[in-house]
C-alpha cells in the first residue's frame, strides 16, 4: 500500500543476474529481503564468516540510509547472522551491496544463489551537531552514569 512516506530508490542489477529485486514479504514488513548473488555455493563452517554479493547497487536519496539486518529465521534456526549489524549503506555509496554473514551455529551452513540472506530497511538520517560543555548537570537523570546491567538483566 502506498502512502505519503514512500520513497523511490534507483536500483541496478549487476552481472545480468536474474534475482528478484528486494521486496517486502508482507504489506506491513519493515525490511525488504536481500538475495545471495554468489554463483558458487558458499560453505559457512561454525565460527566462519563470508562476504556475500547481492547483485544490486542502489542510490539512496539524501536524508536516508539503508540498514542491512539479519533475517530472524536464519538466526534462530541456523545461527546465521549479519556480523556488523546493522550494516549501513550511506546515501553517497554506489557500489554493490554486500552482506557479511557469520555462522554462530554448530553446523556447517551452505548459502546458495538466490537464498534470502538478510533484510534491508530504509531509514531517515538525522545529522547531529556537538555542543561542547564542561558537565552534563542540566541533563541529570535517575540513571546517571550507571550502565552495563544497572537497570536489571
From Swiss-Prot:
User: Which cofactor names does the annotation list?
Assistant: Mg(2+)
UniProt entry keywords in alphabetical sequence: Hydrolase, Magnesium, Metal-binding, Nucleotide metabolism
Does Hydrolase count among this protein's keywords?
yes
User: Which top-rank group of organisms is this from?
Assistant: Bacteria
Biological-process GO terms, alphabetical: dUMP biosynthetic process; dUTP catabolic process
Q: Which SUPFAM superfamilies match?
A: dUTPase-like
Q: What is its EC number?
A: 3.6.1.23
Q: Gene3D superfamilies attached here?
A: 2.70.40.10
| Residues bound to substrate | 71-73, 84, 88-90, 98
Q: What class of enzyme is it?
A: hydrolase
**Pfam families from the xrefs?**
dUTPase (PF00692)
Report the pathway entry: Pyrimidine metabolism; dUMP biosynthesis; dUMP from dCTP (dUTP route): step 2/2
GO MF terms held by the record: dUTP diphosphatase activity; magnesium ion binding
Give the similarity note.
Answer: Belongs to the dUTPase family.
**Any idea what job this protein has?**
This enzyme is involved in nucleotide metabolism: it produces dUMP, the immediate precursor of thymidine nucleotides and it decreases the intracellular concentration of dUTP so that uracil cannot be incorporated into DNA.
Q: What is the protein named?
A: Deoxyuridine 5'-triphosphate nucleotidohydrolase
